[in-house]
Amino acid sequence: AYKLAKAQKDRKKTSYYKTLCEKIFAGNKAQYCQFDFDDNNENTGWFIYDDIMWWTISLARGYELFGVDEYLKLSEASFKRVWYGSEKVGDTGSYDKENGGMFWQWQPIQNPKPNKFGDGKMACINFPTVVAALTLYNNVPENRKESTDKRPDYQTKAQYLAKGKEIYEWGVENLLDKVTGKIADSRHGNGNPAWKAHVYNQATFIGASILLYKATGEKRYLDNAILAADYTVKDMSAEHKVLPFEGGIEQGIYTAIFAEYMAWLVYDCGQTQYLPFLKRTIKTGWANRDKTRNVCGGEYYKKLPEGAEIDSYSASGI
């Protein structure tokens, strides 16, 4: 909304959304241990890698929009926390330096044991890691010197790009069906991938692919993004001809994440063939909204009853 208002040179809306973003940041900082990523309190702290990595992405984007140094500092601190682990918490980090890819969690949350071969590597941490690394690549200074620390506080542009490429390739080899474009939910060791498709995982793979395409110009990344988008549109959305809904708290936001990365695919990469499907999804969901509140549900093909209880995640997609 801020970017749109700025592009339209609407000073009033630009100021409003900038202030709103600042309030959201301040509120979340107060809620989540002042963004101390080494605090593993299970109520207000950090206890799983993918949640931290989403803040890496959000904070890096905040820096990209507003140029606030604190956002970049916290974004890089959270990336370090996930990649290398925490000396305070005692986990060894999400990155598997022996076999590649990113582990999903540390266990137990208190006094954890090192991750081992066979522990889960989920799409929900691997592809967001690529998105985070490439977003930082796009925003850190050009002239940085490579740190010699074992657990560096920052990476150079080249290091962020290399890390993004490495994790992406692991994901392609282990989580992508190269024929259909379906993204597996996870893989444990050498076992078969868990071929349960989620709009969320399709979306982050699309986003990771586009960022690498824009950074390198290599067409294979764009081809992969199109393959995953086609599977989402033609296979996952076949029943109702609009984006599907997955029940459960938080899962309603999957389509909002998908929408963000599809906008990149359509407008930054010229793949306008998806516009009819996206417009149909929007039109269907909006037509079935609760018209008294102008609130949409997550099941776009169903009418939302007036006054029905709806979570913010499910309402966010349209």
Question: Language-model segments: which ranges?
Answer:
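Mobile, glycine-rich extracellular loop/lid and propeptide segments
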Residues: F35, W46-R61, F66-S78, V82, ...
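Alpha-helical scaffold segments in carbohydrate-active enzymes
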Residues: K23, G27, R61, L74-K88, ...
